[in-house]
């Protein structure tokens, strides 16, 4: 990642490693830079002996519906920050506060349902990747935009923020 060669003797044995590339959602909206870097990494892994296969992962497309009533992140952030926000909201970035405050709307019943849905989702994803050693996907779909392009445009900020968080969210939800 740093553009520097890997020292000799530090390469993992990838002979016959079974790697899955999920094709649902995580490869959407890739910019040319990320797409080229990801493809290059996959080619290097394959050249080192890894067996790479693209697989459907429809469970990834289900995550927005699972999180429709709220997310773990919002609930946990609200539980931690609510006292500070109630007394010192101006010390927070307003964009961050708005997201944290979504956690206040999550009921106990919603949270318990979310826990159960997460367990079902994890089981489904684990069943789909059974037989693979790991999943491969870009961490983010695009190179991060310049901050100055987001400061004055709320829609651009939330669109970019959502894209940057999208792929890591799947792994976090898997407790990966």
Segment roles from a protein language model:
Residues 13-20, 71-123, 138:
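Short helix-loop capping/hinge segments that flank enzyme active sites or metal/cofactor-binding pockets
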Residues 24, 57, 138-141:
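Short, well-ordered beta-to-alpha junction loops that form the rim of enzyme active sites
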Residues 32-34, 63-74, 146-152:
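Short glycine/threonine-rich loop-to-helix capping motif typified by GTGT followed
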Residues 1, 106-176:
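Glycine-rich, small-residue loops and helix-cap segments
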Residues 33-56, 82-87, 111-133, 161:
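Acyltransferase
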Residues 51-66, 100-101:
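Short connector loops at secondary-structure junctions
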Residues 1-36, 40-41, 59-62:
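A short helix-breaking turn/cap at a secondary-structure junction
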Residues 7-8, 28-29, 68, 85-88:
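A short glycine-threonine-serine/GTX helix/turn-capping micro-motif
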């Amino acid at each position: 990642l740093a553009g520097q060669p890997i020292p000799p003797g530090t390469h993992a044995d990838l002979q016959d490693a079974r790697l899955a590339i999920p094709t649902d959602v995580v490869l959407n909206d890739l910019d040319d830079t990320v797409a080229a870097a990801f493809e290059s990494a996959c080619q290097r892994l394959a050249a080192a002996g890894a067996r790479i296969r693209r697989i459907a992962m429809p469970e990834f497309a289900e995550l927005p519906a699972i999180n429709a009533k709220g997310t773990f992140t919002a609930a946990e952030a609200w539980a931690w920050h609510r006292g500070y926000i109630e007394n010192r909201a101006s010390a927070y970035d307003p964009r961050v506060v708005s997201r944290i405050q979504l956690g206040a709307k999550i009921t106990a019943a919603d949270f318990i349902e979310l826990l159960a849905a997460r367990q079902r989702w994890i089981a489904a994803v684990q069943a789909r990747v059974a037989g693979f050693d790991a999943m491969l996907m870009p961490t983010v779909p695009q190179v991060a935009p310049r901050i100055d392009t987001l400061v004055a445009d709320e829609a651009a900020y939330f669109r970019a923020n959502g894209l940057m968080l999208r792929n890591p969210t799947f792994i976090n939800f898997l407790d990966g």
